[in-house]
């Protein structure tokens, strides 16, 4: 019964990426890759930690936040770039549906939170 408490902060996280955690490793193993036109909704684990710290340090009443990096390339664009960066391989996708963009702006407005780890900075992710 969390909603009965006077203070709570619920973080709804996008797909998590970080050191030793990148979905491109699993996608490379698949023969068929679906929904290349769908956007990615990802968040770096360092930004998740900062979001948690902002919730703990700035007490607000009853808040629920989506935590998702504000850039949303397509799956085909994003994972193909990652595959080239890490493995010097090209990936192909079936186009499929576009999907939903998850917006994580509310936490930026209400808690002075900043997304500081770009999902396209591949250097430390594998």
Predicted regions and their residues:
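Mid/C-terminal beta-alpha module of Rossmann-like enzyme folds, strongest
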Residues: 49-104
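Short beta-loop-alpha junction of Rossmann-like oxidoreductase domains
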Residues: 19-26, 77
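Residues that recognize and position ribonucleotide moieties
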Residues: 9, 41, 100
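Amphipathic terminal alpha-helices
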Residues: 119-126
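Alpha-helical substrate-binding/gating segment
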Residues: 24-32, 37-65
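Conserved beta-loop-beta element that borders a ligand/cofactor-binding pocket
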Residues: 1-19
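Amphipathic alpha-helical segment in the mid-to-C-terminal domain
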Residues: 45, 75, 112-116
């Amino acid at each position: 019964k969390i909603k009965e408490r006077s203070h709570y902060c619920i973080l709804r996280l996008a797909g998590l990426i970080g050191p030793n955690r990148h979905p491109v490793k699993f996608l490379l193993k698949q023969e068929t890759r679906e929904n290349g036109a769908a956007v990615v909704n990802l968040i770096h684990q360092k930004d998740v930690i900062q979001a948690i710290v902002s919730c703990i340090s700035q007490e607000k009443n009853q808040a629920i936040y989506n935590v998702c990096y504000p850039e949303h390339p397509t799956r085909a664009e994003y994972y193909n770039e990652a595959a080239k960066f890490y493995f010097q391989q090209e990936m192909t996708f079936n186009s499929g549906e576009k999907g939903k963009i998850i917006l994580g702006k509310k936490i930026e407005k209400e808690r002075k939170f900043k997304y500081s780890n770009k999902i396209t900075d591949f250097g430390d992710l594998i």
